[in-house]
Regions:
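C-terminal motif of bacterial Sec signal peptides marking the signal peptidase cleavage site
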Residues: 16-19
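Cyclophilin-like peptidyl-prolyl cis-trans isomerases
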Residues: 21-304
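Bacterial N-terminal signal peptides that target proteins for export
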Residues: 1-9
Length: 304
């Protein structure tokens, strides 16, 4: 699988929430006391707001969690922290039932529960000729955290909007095995050299051998022959391709299509033209084809 490109990632920041570190206030004062706590409902890789009620909350507090990172105490409206009401934010980095530990004065002041659902992304696909619908992709950050975070950064920046599935990979016997896209803006043609791929972010480390496999309807990262070269391009396995788990160092699976598998099948059956041109080093000229009309990704959003 071949991929290229580089676009600066636009990670969402928590506007209005400033300050630094996990604590604030004066060390050595009265021990902080937490009498109540709550959180908002946060999705994976988004901002969790933690609200603490009690006394002496302007003293030094330390917040930690196995499922949230980069704790910040808020001092800016509308979340202005005080001695009796404190607000902290962090970016969720785990899924399931999790906790935040609040410590101060050498003791644990509170344990705050929160939960994060398995993240999902919805792709809107349309070729303008009857093949259209939504693909809901459930992501697996437990096994492939770097790959999932990379994919979500592209999704949140709008990078995938109006890109295409440009390559329908087929074997020498013309059996479809992958549908690859996410690197080229529409339109592309089987008779004209592809334009340059969209500029993408820096390549990421390869995450393989972590319990996920290139089975039918799974989603994986395309890359060059260099192991740590994946950027934006993805591919859907349209058949079981377990050989790709180890072939050439393996290809990183990081999710699967959990709603819309019939659409994947329709994409496989959509019109596709062999190309006489060598678009990129991932194209096998004699078997691979370009879906025409283009199978366009009209939108990509994190929906859970």
């Amino acid at each position: 699988m071949k991929t290229r490109a580089t676009l600066a990632l636009g990670l969402i920041s928590a506007a209005l929430l400033t300050a630094c570190g996990g604590g604030g206030g004066d060390a050595g004062g009265p021990a902080p006391v937490v009498t109540a706590s709550s959180t908002n409902t946060a999705r994976y890789s988004e901002t969790l707001l933690i609200t603490l009620t009690g006394s002496n909350l302007d003293q030094s507090l330390t917040l930690s969690s196995a499922g949230c990172r980069n704790f910040v105490r808020s001092t800016t409206a509308p979340f202005v922290s005080s001695a009796t009401l404190a607000y902290y934010t962090c970016t969720t980095s785990g899924v399931g039932n999790l906790t935040v530990t609040v410590s101060g004065g050498g003791v644990t002041a509170a344990t705050v529960p929160f939960s994060v659902s398995q993240p999902q992304v919805t792709l809107l696909v349309n070729n303008g000729a009857g093949v259209s619908g939504t693909l809901v992709i459930t992501l697996r950050p437990q096994e492939a955290p770097t790959t999932v975070d990379n994919f979500l950064a592209y999704v949140k920046s709008g990078f995938y909007n109006n890109t295409v599935f440009h390559r329908h990979g087929r074997t020498a016997t013309s059996t479809p095995f992958v549908m690859q896209g996410g690197g080229y803006a529409a339109p592309v043609s089987s008779t004209v050299l592809f334009p340059a791929p969209k500029a993408a972010s820096a390549p990421i480390a390869l995450e393989v051998g972590r319990g996920l496999s290139n089975v039918r309807y799974s989603l994986a990262m395309a890359r060059t022959n260099v192991l740590n070269s994946a950027t934006s391009e993805i591919f859907i396995n349209t058949v079981d391709n377990v050989v790709l788990d180890t072939s050439g160092g393996g290809y990183a699976v990081f999710g699967s299509v959990t709603t819309g598998t019939t659409l994947v099948d329709a994409m496989v059956a959509a019109p596709c033209n062999l190309s006489p041109l060598h678009f990129n080093s991932g194209f096998t000229i004699s078997t691979d084809c370009v879906p025409e009309p283009n199978l366009m990704i009209a939108g990509a959003t994190q929906t859970r």
